[in-house]
Amino acid sequence: MKRSEKRILTTHVGSLVRPPELSRYIEAIDNGVKVDQAAFDRSLADSVADVIKRQQQVGVDIVSDGEFGKFRSWSFYVLDRLGGIEERAVEAARGAGRDQQMFADFYAEYFPTQKLPKRGTVVCVGPLTYKGHAAVRKDIEIFKAGLKGAAVADAFLPVVAPASAVPRHKNEYYKDDEEFLFKLAEALREEYKAIVDAGLMVQIDDAFLPYMYDVAFAVDQLTISEVGGGPHRGAQSRHRRLAGRPHPLSHLLGQL
């Protein structure tokens, strides 16, 4: 990570608004529609190069790829990069969290605008492994190609934290959820390593951290002390993922 003694270097959380053409491709992919792969790859590469230039133009020092290559959303993209899991038919929802209950009118208007594809229930059925080497390599190559000639201080790729990767899952293989979470951390560490080894910063997004409290209080009626174990295990799993990684090349983001 670059340091500055003259001023504070600027950055952002990582995700940026996708251009319309790229959004149409990703919406089609998310809904299982076959697209022209070569045309999509060109659109993705052009979009990443353009968003890097736009960040530079507005004065952002530490830029990202906008998370443009994460098709299934900022967290669900990783499901295509993991072995040992499968998706099954959607089960009944657990219920709305406290925030959704308090602002029901807002969410009633918000959700229909998001065009979210239907998600199945994520089930762990075997040993968790990482199989996304080609995908993360593509992320890196497209990002680094877009960075050529860019006058920026540094660059980072956002990735999902273990606890946020599959926040609503069923575990049918490991002895308990704690073992599941730590095995997931070990698998996802390979994605971290690939990014850091490529000379880029890696950002860990754990946006489901506040959601854990929101749902636990409103739906499960748990106390603060009872909820605390989940975030604590999530933090431990992140540290395990970072084992052997240079700390200056990584940072944690809990989006509130």
What is the predicted role of each segment?
Residues 1-256:
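Domain-level signal for soluble alpha/beta catalytic cores
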